[in-house]
Every structure is written in structure tokens, then in C-alpha cells.
Amino acid sequence: MIRVAINGYGRIGRSILRALYESAKRDRIQIVAINELAKPEAMLHLTQYDTTHGRFHTQVKLDNQHMIIGDDAIKLLHEPDPAKLPWKEMDIDIVFEATGVINDRLECEAHIQAGAKQVLISHPSSSDVDATIVFGVNQDLLKAEHTVVSNASCTTNCIVPVIDVLDRHFEVKSGAITTIHSAMNDQQVIDAYHDDLRRTRAAGQSIIPVDTKLARGIERILPHMKDKFEAISVRVPTINVTAIDLSVTLNKRVDIETVNQVLKQATEGSFSGVVGFTNEPLVSCDFNHDPRSSIVDGTQTRVSDGHLVKLLLWCDNEWGFANRMLDTSLEMIKAKSRT
């Protein structure tokens, strides 16, 4: 049984907990502690009720600085300094670092110094971590000695498996990406100050361009794609689910049927449970609470001149990513057991 602590109980932290309790992984992963500066009553309430994912299906209550979920007692901590957390005495195997602000090796080492054996970061990190993993593509890179690992981003997890399939079958020459991402908590409800002038504007009233490092994220997972992709991102007034408009130029000649067939076969084979494929006329809310990293919308596949391919990909940027955190943590422990 993997003993896990969650540091940061926001959108991703809560989704990880809920995803675990809805999955078949509870016999292998146990959340024993959550460190969050918010009050326990607020943590309890936001565990029980969620605007995006609905009510939690299991009874939850507070008891003596613990959150009780069924028969499980999860210790609630409120320590701002990770180095002071009681990870050694709690025998923590992996810390899910989900604050969104700790993203390099030096900062994560505080968890190791506090006694945790490994750290899995829930967002893109600096290049000094041991590995950046997109589950389904490169988890085989994990080694026993790795202590700080990044789970990349929701959009990297969405797009990299698809690029990988296209490249192996048709040789990707170059590509351009537009991420159509739901609003996030770094935006304003009404106009208010922010360092990014576009993010001073009300999130519910505009389509807002934001910076993205998605192209660099692709290069980190697929190094041979260096300088082959560019990406832009816009935030839209929805609370969950992201669409990605992917255009790629392929060296090999293709048609719509061939592209869709190859992608569909991948979802039934090596990427089963990670990438999906649909030919149904669906919209973004239909992918809410979908545990997969990416769903290819076959109805939107287009091919121009036999080499330029446009795809539409969907993902639940919270739920799919939370499920990959669980998957990657299991792979980290598996790699560690190979010593």
C-alpha cells in the first residue's frame, strides 16, 4: 500500500482524492494526510460539494483534525513550510505536490528533507527534476533513484500521446496548436488587477489569450520534436473541459479515414484507458468527469493536400489529469521496487 500525502488541496488536490475513491486503486494507494492552509471546515465542505463534479458519493466528516471518509482517517495539516511537515513519522511514500507554486527540485527537496521518499508534482516543472512523465508515453523512463518527478500538464497529457501515434505511423514534420482552455482560478471574476493585463479582465465575459509553454512541454517528452511545434492558448468562459485544435504536417500521405483508423486502433491498444476516440456529435460538457487524458473527436478530423491534418481533442483538464497522477504514482513505486 502506497502512503500518500497531498500538499495543496485546491482543484487538483481535491480531484485526486475524489478520483482515488471512485477508482479501483484504493487497494494500492492510501491518502493519509492533506496539508492545506484553509480551514478544516472549508476543506470538508469543498470535498462534499463540488460545482463541477457534483456531490461526493461517500460520507465525509471532521473528527479531531482528521477528515473521515468511510473507514479512512486522513490527517489535516496547516503548515506553510514543507520542511516542517511530519512526513517521516507518518511514513509517507509519495507527496502529491499540488499547490501550483512549488515547481522545482530545490523547493520539492523540502518534502524529502521532511521524510517523504518521493514527490510527484501536479504541474510542469523546471528541468532539474528527475523526470517529466506523460503516462502512456514515457513512464518507462522512471528509475528507482528518482525522487522528484513532474506529471507535466493536463494539455501535455492530452496532446503528446496523439502526436506520438501520428509520428510513429506517418512521421510528423511540424505542427501548430491552439488550446481552448476553461477558465482557471488565476483569472478574475470581475475586472481586477493582475500582472498579466489580459487576466485583469472578467473571466466569464471574454475569450482571453494567455501564455503557454505547451510546445516546450512536448519537446521535453518527445525530444526529437524540438522546434517542430508552436502553440497558443485562449481561456474561455466555461468552468471545465478543454479542447485542443491540433494541426500537423505529415511526411507520409494520408486521408481522413486512415488517420481516424490509426488513432482509433491506438485507443483500443496501447493507449486504452488513456486516450479515447468518438464519432458522436458531442460538446465540451459531455467530457466532464472523463478519466482519460485525451479524446479524439473523429467527426472533426480534416486533411488538406494529403499531408496537412487538423484534429480536435477533448480532455477534462481536472479529472483526467488527477487520474494520471494516480497512475504515475503507481509507476514510481513500481520503478522503486526494481532495486
Swiss-Prot record:
SMART domains (UniProt xref): Gp_dh_N
Organism field: Shewanella pealeana (strain ATCC 700345 / ANG-SQ1)
Catalytic activity: D-erythrose 4-phosphate + NAD(+) + H2O = 4-phospho-D-erythronate + NADH + 2 H(+)
Listed name of the protein: D-erythrose-4-phosphate dehydrogenase
GO cellular component, one term: cytoplasm
This protein's encoding gene: epd
Binding sites annotated in the UniProt record for NAD(+): 11-12, 317
EC number: 1.2.1.72
UniProt-annotated binding residues for substrate: 153-155, 199, 212-213, 235
Pathway(s) it belongs to: Cofactor biosynthesis; pyridoxine 5'-phosphate biosynthesis; pyridoxine 5'-phosphate from D-erythrose 4-phosphate: step 1/5
Site description Activates thiol group during catalysis, residues in chain: 181
Active-site residues, as the UniProt record annotates them: 154 (nucleophile)
CDD domains membership: GAPDH_C_E4PDH (cd23937), GAPDH_N_E4PDH (cd17892)
InterPro entries: E4P_DH_bac, GlycerAld/Erythrose_P_DH, GlycerAld_3-P_DH_AS, GlycerAld_3-P_DH_cat, GlycerAld_3-P_DH_NAD(P)-bd, Glyceraldehyde-3-P_DH_1, NAD(P)-bd_dom_sf
